[in-house]
């Protein structure tokens, strides 16, 4: 019987492994034409592998695989999807890409592998993606990038790596890669060298470097000079110093060489100086250090992803580009659309999109004072002004905003539904103001917001459901406020990847209903709070231990009790922190519980993001099949056993009847009964033995 079970399981697994199904013909996925393009939508289908499936071979299509369980990609994983022109793999829990996984996808131009758990890009990770122009890998756990990771991507122009754990970029990582748009926000970069890194992206049109712990020392001098020499408006956002302390919070472009390098009186002689104005070339095509087959020998401006025009690539190969010269009279010059810029502000075109309006430090006291109103503003900077309140009416004419900076004002009042018209807003800065309460109504309408910075306010209260209005929020900066507690379910409905709560007044943070909702967290900063190292903090400590040092940014020091003052409670054992609890537990249980994932007494919930007890489906399916087959054979065996028992019972009944007849025959033969017919009227009932035979 066991042999039959094994044979059946093997045959079924073999058959299942060789069946190839068309995801469109068999209606496994939703396949629809949208604006002439076929979209193959396989969202949340539970796929763990794609080698058993195929897609239409007669036309090109966009392949959507987000929300599945493709945790590992093996070589030739997409061999049956060779007509795909874009690939979306967000939210798959993907943690490993084996080199060769993308072989066959030579037509793919856009690859989205964001919101996964990828830790490294190895050499030849992207082998096979010959035509790739756009790579999005933000919100991963990316730490290590091999110098040859992008060497096969000779057409890559847009590289999005924000919100990872990158602390350094290797030399020659961008060699022969024609990068024009680079996003490195929200990583752990302290410096970016010019040689062998920045010098290899001469065609840069847009770069984002915010939210990195920049170390503003001599090593950052080359980055500062490079930023000053790239095209105007190429830098999006700010580069803010994290260290040294004397420069903390200062914008890099506001520093001087003396600030960065006090002991050095001149620029590092190893860096090539930018050419003098008279040495610059006249506008025209120049050779670039990268070429592909069939590509002409000129700069590659190309087309921006959104359909706009990129800045022309007038770059030199071995020297940094010359800074664009902006005259004072051009700042308030009428724009191409003949709309003047509000007085005191400067307006610039964003390549391929709308306007960037800079009203920083212009003594603006109200947004109503900004006249005329420009409807196509996408980035509005109002930092360092005297604004006291903001109201819904202020943003009626700014429906296209993507970035809004209201930092370092005097804002204490935000009218409910103020941002309701800003449906496209992605970045909101309200740091260094006087906000004291956050509520859902204040942020209504911000359905696409990804970044919210409200540090350095006076926030004491966050009402329940505040962040539900921002379902796409990924980065939340709440440090340096007056917070003492967080409401239950405060993070329900959002998938935060980075959270800053340092320098508040938290004595402990509950796990259940608060921290256990941070299932997508990749970086959290909690230092500078007055932690009370007593029994109540044990669940929080165990949660922090499960995160590990890669996610937890800094040490957590006790404020009370006195014997633990300024000690990192992560280095203390649970029985030291809570001796009265562990004194009740046997030594065996105590030693076991030190490494456990939670205490039943404290109601700590395990974090599903770190749950390693899940069974792989490749093990689960054969196991269930074996159980099913075994159960079937067991049922059949029981039926056979029951039928055999019935036959034996019938035989016993037949033998018993024969014995009774023989006994009756014996009695008749002894003439105990009178011969003759049955006489009902007699004193005795008499049977006619002669009328019966054994055959009856």
UniProtKB/Swiss-Prot annotation:
Where does it localize?
A: Membrane; Secreted; Synapse
Q: Which SMART domains match?
A: LRR_TYP, LRRCT
Q: What does the UniProt record report as the effect of altering residue 695 to A in this chain?
A: Loss of phosphorylation. Not able to promote neurite outgrowth
* Signal sequence residues: 1-17
Topology feature Cytoplasmic, residues: 644-696
Query: Keyword annotations for this protein?
Result: Glycoprotein, Leucine-rich repeat, Membrane, Phosphoprotein, Repeat, Secreted, Signal, Synapse, Transmembrane, Transmembrane helix
State if Ligase is listed as a keyword. Answer: no
Entry comment on modification after translation? Undergoes proteolytic cleavage that results in shedding of the ectodomain and cleavage of the C-terminal cytoplasmic tail. Glycosylated. Phosphorylation at Ser-695 is necessary for proper function in promoting neurite outgrowth.
* Phenotype for residue 695 to E: Able to promote neurite outgrowth as the wild-type
List each coiled-coil range: none
Membrane spanning stretches: 623-643
Please indicate the ranges of residues that lie on the Extracellular side. 18-622
* Substitution effect: residue 584 to K: In TTM; uncertain significance; does not affect synaptogenesis
Q: How does it assemble?
A: Can form homodimers; homodimerization requires repeat LRR 2. Interacts with YWHAB, YWHAE, YWHAG, YWHAH, SFN, YWHAQ and YWHAZ.
Q: What does it do?
A: It is involved in synaptogenesis and promotes excitatory synapse differentiation. Enhances neuronal dendrite outgrowth.
Q: What is this protein called?
A: SLIT and NTRK-like protein 1
- Organism this protein belongs to: Homo sapiens (Human)
> Lineage in the entry?
Eukaryota, Metazoa, Chordata, Craniata, Vertebrata
């Amino acid at each position: 019987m066991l042999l039959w079970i094994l044979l059946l399981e093997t045959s079924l697994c073999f058959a299942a492994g060789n069946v190839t199904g068309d995801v469109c013909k068999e209606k496994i996925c939703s396949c629809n034409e949208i604006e002439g393009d076929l979209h193959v939508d396989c969202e949340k289908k539970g796929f763990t592998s794609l080698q058993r499936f195929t897609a239409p071979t007669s036309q090109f299509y966009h392949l959507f695989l987000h929300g599945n369980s493709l945790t590992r990609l093996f070589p030739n994983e997409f061999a049956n999807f060779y007509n795909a022109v874009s690939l979306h793999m967000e939210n798959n829990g993907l943690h490993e890409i084996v080199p060769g996984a993308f072989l066959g996808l030579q037509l793919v131009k856009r690859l989205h592998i964001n919101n996964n758990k990828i830790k490294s890009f190895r050499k030849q990770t992207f082998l096979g993606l010959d035509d790739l122009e756009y790579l999005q890998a933000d919100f991963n756990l990316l730490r290590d990038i091999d110098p040859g990771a992008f060497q096969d991507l000779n057409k890559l122009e847009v590289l999005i790596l924000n919100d990872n754990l990158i602390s350094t970029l290797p030399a020659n990582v961008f060699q022969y890669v024609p990068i024009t748009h680079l996003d490195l926000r929200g990583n752990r970069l302290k410096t970016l060298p010019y040689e062998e890194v920045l010098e290899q992206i001469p065609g840069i049109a847009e770069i984002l470097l915010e939210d990195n712990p920049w170390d503003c020392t001599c090593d950052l001098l080359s980055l500062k000079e490079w930023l000053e020499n790239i095209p105007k408006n190429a830098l999006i956002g700010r580069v803010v110093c994290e260290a040294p302390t004397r420069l903390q919070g200062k914008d890099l472009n506001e520093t001087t060489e003396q600030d960065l390098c006090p002991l050095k009186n001149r620029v590092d002689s190893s860096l090539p100086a930018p050419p003098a104005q008279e040495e610059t070339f006249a506008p025209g095509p120049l050779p670039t250090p990268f070429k592909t087959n069939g590509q002409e020998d000129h700069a590659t401006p190309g087309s921006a992803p959104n359909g706009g025009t990129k800045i022309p690539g007038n770059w030199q190969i071995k020297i940094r580009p010359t800074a664009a010269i902006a005259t004072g009279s051009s700042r308030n010059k009428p724009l191409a659309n003949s709309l003047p810029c509000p007085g005191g502000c400067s307006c610039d075109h964003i390549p391929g999109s709308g306007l960037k309006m800079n009203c920083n430090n212009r003594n603006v006291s109200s947004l109503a004072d900004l006249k005329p109103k420009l409807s196509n503003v996408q980035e509005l900077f109002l930092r360092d002004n005297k604004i006291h309140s903001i109201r819904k009416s202020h943003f009626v004419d700014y429906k296209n905003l993507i970035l809004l900076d209201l930092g370092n004002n005097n804002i204490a009042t935000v009218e409910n539904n103020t941002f309701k018209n800003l449906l496209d807003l992605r970045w909101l800065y309200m740091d260094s103001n006087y906000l004291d309460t956050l509520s859902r109504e204040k942020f209504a309408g911000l359905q696409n917001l990804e970044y919210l910075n409200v540090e350095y306010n006076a926030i004491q209260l966050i009402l329940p459901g505040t962040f539900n209005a921002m379902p796409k929020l990924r980065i939340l900066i709440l440090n340096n406020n007056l917070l003492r507690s967080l409401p239950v379910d405060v993070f329900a409905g959002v998938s935060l990847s980075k959270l800053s709560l340092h320098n508040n007044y938290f004595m402990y943070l509950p796990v259940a209903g608060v921290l256990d909702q941070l299932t997508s967290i990749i970086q959290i900063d909690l230092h500078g709070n007055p932690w009370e190292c007593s029994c109540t903090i044990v669940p929080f400590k165990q949660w922090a231990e499960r995160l590990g040092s890669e996610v937890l940014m800094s040490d957590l020091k006790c404020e009370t009790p006195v014997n633990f003052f300024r000690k990192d409670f992560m280095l203390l054992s649970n029985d030291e922190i809570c001796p009265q609890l562990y004194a009740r537990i046997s030594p065996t249980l105590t030693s076991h519980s030190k490494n456990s994932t939670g205490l039943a007494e404290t109601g700590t919930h395990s974090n599903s993001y770190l749950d390693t007890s899940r069974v792989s489906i490749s093990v689960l399916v054969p196991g269930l099949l074996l159980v099913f087959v075994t159960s079937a054979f067991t049922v059949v065996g029981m039926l056979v056993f029951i039928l055999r028992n019935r036959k034996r019972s019938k035989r016993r009944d037949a033998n018993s009847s024969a014995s009774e007849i023989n006994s009756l025959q014996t009695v008749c033969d002894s003439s105990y009964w009178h011969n003759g017919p049955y006489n009902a009227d007699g004193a005795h009932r008499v049977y006619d033995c002669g009328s019966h035979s054994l055959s009856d």
